[in-house]
């Protein structure tokens, strides 16, 4: 049996090429077998606007990336028009192959040492008051990218002293304590790490990740920074039950997580995991009530909710659906 061809740095693998070597194979969906989107998910998206064009141009001119574009987020137009964006640092190539995610897989390029300064200047030019900084998984880096996160936070605050910063971090697999030591030098205003789904679905949805590791990351950060809110997000529609999701919410609270986002999974292409169920808005409302009953201070639950969707409003405690 021949070895698989070695990936070249900077080459993006998507769709079938991306998911070809995951433990639970994804069978490409046929159109006639795909669930029809219900009316509550039919959102009319504007093709463009001056604000959308301005933000895209600012990103392009500085060589920056937004997860809004790279992950094909359905809320891109709304968020860009609102003047918010979630910046994706450390490149646009992930070392993982999660079959729910539309971000490309491959061998990433070396981190751009100038990215923290370019990011800070772009945020200043855009006059943003609240930003979310996330990244691809960088298993190729000894610290998982933690130092780059800290550098970005420091540079952003130097140019934007009044800004609030939320970080949506990867799991720093195998290097949690080292990563947290680094992040302690520049802690964010909100610390976010997504569990994504219930543990029994990790093998098919999050190959390479571990449910308990992710919970431990959130708990250990909170122990070090008790005044910084911790946050996590989940998708629904991957085959989980509401009872399984309720147990995940209990696990999050047991690990001192205070903020929650819960939204509907949408299949990016026929090569990604299929949607097994569209969850009605009423069920999201029921889970929001349950989350608040067990102690979450903020719970944004609804079909179109994403981890960074109106993150500024979530942080203010305003209701987001």
Swiss-Prot record:
CC annotations in GO: cytoplasm
Pathway(s) of this molecule: Protein modification; protein lipoylation via endogenous pathway; protein N(6)-(lipoyl)lysine from octanoyl-[acyl-carrier-protein]: step 2/2
Cofactors required: [4Fe-4S] cluster
Intracellular or extracellular location(s): Cytoplasm
Keywords carried by this UniProt record: 4Fe-4S, Cytoplasm, Iron, Iron-sulfur, Metal-binding, S-adenosyl-L-methionine, Transferase
The keyword Glycoprotein is assigned to this record: no
Co-factor: note: Binds 2 [4Fe-4S] clusters per subunit. One cluster is coordinated with 3 cysteines and an exchangeable S-adenosyl-L-methionine.
InterPro entries (UniProt xref): Aldolase_TIM, Elp3/MiaA/NifB-like_rSAM, LIAS_N, Lipoyl_synth, rSAM
Key word Metal-binding present: yes
Enzyme Commission designation: 2.8.1.8
Organism lineage: Bacteria, Pseudomonadati, Pseudomonadota, Gammaproteobacteria, Alteromonadales
Family: Belongs to the radical SAM superfamily. Lipoyl synthase family.
GO molecular function: 4 iron, 4 sulfur cluster binding; lipoate synthase activity; metal ion binding
Residue ranges of every copy of the Radical SAM core domain listed in the record: 80-297
Catalytic activity, reaction form: [[Fe-S] cluster scaffold protein carrying a second [4Fe-4S](2+) cluster] + N(6)-octanoyl-L-lysyl-[protein] + 2 oxidized [2Fe-2S]-[ferredoxin] + 2 S-adenosyl-L-methionine + 4 H(+) = [[Fe-S] cluster scaffold protein] + N(6)-[(R)-dihydrolipoyl]-L-lysyl-[protein] + 4 Fe(3+) + 2 hydrogen sulfide + 2 5'-deoxyadenosine + 2 L-methionine + 2 reduced [2Fe-2S]-[ferredoxin]
Pfam families xrefs: LIAS_N, Radical_SAM
Top-level class of the enzyme under EC nomenclature: transferase
Protein's UniProt name: Lipoyl synthase
The gene coding this protein: lipA
Binding-site list for [4Fe-4S] cluster 2: 94, 98, 101
């Amino acid at each position: 049996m021949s070895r698989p061809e070695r990936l070249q740095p900077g080459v993006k693998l998507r769709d079938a090429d991306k998911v070809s070597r995951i433990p639970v194979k994804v069978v490409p969906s046929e159109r006639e077998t795909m669930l029809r989107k219900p009316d509550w998910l039919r959102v009319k998206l504007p093709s463009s606007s001056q604000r959308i064009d301005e933000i895209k141009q600012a990103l392009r001119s500085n060589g920056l990336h937004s997860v809004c574009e790279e992950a094909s987020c359905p809320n891109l137009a709304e968020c860009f028009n609102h003047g918010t964006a979630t910046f994706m640092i450390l490149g646009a190539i992930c070392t993982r192959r999660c079959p729910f995610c539309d971000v490309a897989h491959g061998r990433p390029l070396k981190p751009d040492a100038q990215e923290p300064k370019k990011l800070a200047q772009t945020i200043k030019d855009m006059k943003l008051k609240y930003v979310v900084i996330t990244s691809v998984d960088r298993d190729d880096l000894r610290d998982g990218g933690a130092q780059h996160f800290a550098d970005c936070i420091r540079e952003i605050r130097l140019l934007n002293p009044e800004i609030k910063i939320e970080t949506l971090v990867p799991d720093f697999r195998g290097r949690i304590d080292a990563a947290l030591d680094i992040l302690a030098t520049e802690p964010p205003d909100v610390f976010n790490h997504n569990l994504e789904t219930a543990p029994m679905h990790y093998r098919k949805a999050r190959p390479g990740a571990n449910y308990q590791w992710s919970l431990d990351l959130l708990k250990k950060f909170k122990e070090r920074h008790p005044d910084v809110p911790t946050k996590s997000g989940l998708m629904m529609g991957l085959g989980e039950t509401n009872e399984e999701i309720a147990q995940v919410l209990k696990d999050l609270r047991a690990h001192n997580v205070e903020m929650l986002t819960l939204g509907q999974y949408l299949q990016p292409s026929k090569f990604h995991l299929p949607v097994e169920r569209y969850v009605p808005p009423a069920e999201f409302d029921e889970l929001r009530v349950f989350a608040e009953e067990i102690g979450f201070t903020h719970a944004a639950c609804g079909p179109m909710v994403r981890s960074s969707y109106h993150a500024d409003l979530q942080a203010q405690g305003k209701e987001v659906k």
